[in-house]
Amino acid sequence: MKNLVAQKWIDECGTLFPIDGNTVLYPTPGSGIFELYQGKGQDKRIGLKKLSEKFEFNHKIYDVGCDNLFDIIQKTWESDKFVEENKNLGVIFTGYKGTGKSVGAKLLCNRLDIPVIIIPDNEIEGMVSFIQQLDFECIV
């Protein structure tokens, strides 16, 4: 006989929804690379689909002296002022096409070891609201 796991129910604003009994609840998605995902069902629920643990490169990455800059960014992010005052930190990469902006951003993401959320090309209804309601440190 098949092992049956009791169905669980979640309460969302007074409405109960059934979920699989094997469902595990986490306070955050944890570190990794995620893509914003919208379910195909009737409710079109938005979630995060894990793509990988870290950004991986299938080509050699040369040392171009970014470690000092990454150190400054990481020290700023982890500083008492940012932690105590719950501040945000924006980093803008600029340069011509092919100069390594995307690679640099991915290397920084790997180093900070916090969730990275990739926004897909297709439009997701309710995406802005979903992102605004995230209550954990992440890179979008």
Question: Can you say where each PLM-predicted feature lies in the sequence?
Answer:
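AAA+ P-loop ATPase mechanoenzymes
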Residues: 1-79, 93-98, 108, 134-135
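Phosphate-binding P-loop
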Residues: 77-88
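Walker A/P-loop
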Residues: 87-119, 130-132
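Short acidic loop-to-helix transition motifs that present clustered carboxylates
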Residues: 121-127
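Conserved nucleotide-sensing/catalytic segment adjacent to the nucleotide-binding pocket
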Residues: 128-140
